[in-house]
């Protein structure tokens, strides 16, 4: 699993797309375009606003859809925040925020096979993640984003810092990244990115993913 993480470049966060009812088709398209890791994150989504928070059984059902799609495309499936859901869904990856479970507690729940990542938003957090127990970390937001309302964006300066201190540990730039902004992110030193709307809001998710992946691979 660590070798797959090392080669991963494009990480997608998607909601359950309840208002559209097309999660399976969307996931297949995005993964066919080159997404390496696909994560379910329904917080603040249009579906949550319309239908309310995703219940645990519905979250597991959505996880099963994404896990099956990821397996078909030799990609990895990630769960956000919830170590119990990650274990029940047999997720490849669990992603934690700074205020979520400590990494050692989460790993005790998921088991050793599940990779664990963590969000970082300042230099101290980046430095800690670079030498800590997480398998990868995310750096940002690079720009303000509606998926994290009210959060100050540390910007590309933090990406440059991560590029200097991360060493061999995989890390991903995150926050407001799309095809137009990707060259700036690459110039700052990132070689892996997390995206949301750049693919979820695209008319052709497969094409959007393929374009991003092509630019990422060209920068290696």
From Swiss-Prot:
Protein residues bound to 2-[(2R,5Z)-2-carboxy-4-methylthiazol-5(2H)-ylidene]ethyl phosphate: 145-147, 176
Pathway: Cofactor biosynthesis; thiamine diphosphate biosynthesis; thiamine phosphate from 4-amino-2-methyl-5-diphosphomethylpyrimidine and 4-methyl-5-(2-phosphoethyl)-thiazole: step 1/1
Cofactor(s) for this UniProt protein: Mg(2+)
GO cellular component annotations of the record: cytoplasm
Reactions this protein catalyses: 2-[(2R,5Z)-2-carboxy-4-methylthiazol-5(2H)-ylidene]ethyl phosphate + 4-amino-2-methyl-5-(diphosphooxymethyl)pyrimidine + 2 H(+) = thiamine phosphate + CO2 + diphosphate; 2-(2-carboxy-4-methylthiazol-5-yl)ethyl phosphate + 4-amino-2-methyl-5-(diphosphooxymethyl)pyrimidine + 2 H(+) = thiamine phosphate + CO2 + diphosphate; 4-methyl-5-(2-phosphooxyethyl)-thiazole + 4-amino-2-methyl-5-(diphosphooxymethyl)pyrimidine + H(+) = thiamine phosphate + diphosphate
CDD domains (UniProt xref): TMP_TenI
One of the GO BP terms on file: thiamine biosynthetic process
Enzyme Commission (EC) number: 2.5.1.3
Coiled coil: none
GO molecular function, one term: magnesium ion binding
Pfam families reported in the protein's UniProt record: TMP-TENI
Residues binding Mg(2+): 81, 100
Cofactor info, note text: Binds 1 Mg(2+) ion per subunit.
Binding site for 4-amino-2-methyl-5-(diphosphooxymethyl)pyrimidine: 39-43, 80, 119, 148
InterPro entries with a match to the protein in the record: Aldolase_TIM, ThiamineP_synth_sf, ThiamineP_synth_TenI, TMP_synthase
Keyword annotations: Magnesium, Metal-binding, Thiamine biosynthesis, Transferase
Function: Condenses 4-methyl-5-(beta-hydroxyethyl)thiazole monophosphate (THZ-P) and 2-methyl-4-amino-5-hydroxymethyl pyrimidine pyrophosphate (HMP-PP) to form thiamine monophosphate (TMP).
Similarity annotation: Belongs to the thiamine-phosphate synthase family.
UniProt-listed NCBIfam families: thiE
Protein name according to UniProt: Thiamine-phosphate synthase
The organism of origin for this protein: Mycobacterium ulcerans (strain Agy99)
Gene name of the encoded protein: thiE
């Amino acid at each position: 699993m660590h070798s797959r993480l090392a080669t991963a470049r494009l990480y997608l966060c998607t909601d359950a797309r309840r208002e559209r009812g097309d999660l399976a088709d969307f996931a297949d398209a995005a993964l066919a375009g080159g997404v390496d890791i696909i994560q379910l994150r329904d917080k603040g989504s249009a579906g949550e606003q319309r239908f309310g928070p995703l219940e645990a059984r519905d979250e597991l059902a959505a996880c099963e859809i994404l896990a099956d799609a990821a397996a078909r495309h030799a990609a990895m499936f990630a769960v956000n925040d919830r170590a119990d859901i990650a274990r029940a869904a047999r997720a490849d990856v669990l992603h934690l925020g700074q205020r979520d479970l400590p990494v050692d507690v989460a790993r005790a729940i998921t088991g050793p096979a599940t990779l664990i990542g963590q969000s970082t938003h300042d230099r101290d957090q980046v430095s800690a993640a670079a030498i800590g127990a997480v398998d990868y970390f995310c750096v940002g937001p690079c720009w303000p984003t509606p998926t994290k309302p009210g959060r100050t964006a540390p910007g590309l300066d933090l990406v440059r810092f991560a590029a200097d201190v991360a060493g061999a540990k995989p890390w991903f730039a995150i926050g407001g990244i799309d095809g137009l902004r990707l060259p700036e992110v690459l110039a700052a030193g990132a070689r892996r990115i997390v995206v949301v709307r750049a693919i979820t809001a695209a008319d052709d998710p497969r094409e959007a993913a393929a374009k991003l992946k092509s630019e990422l691979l060209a920068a290696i």
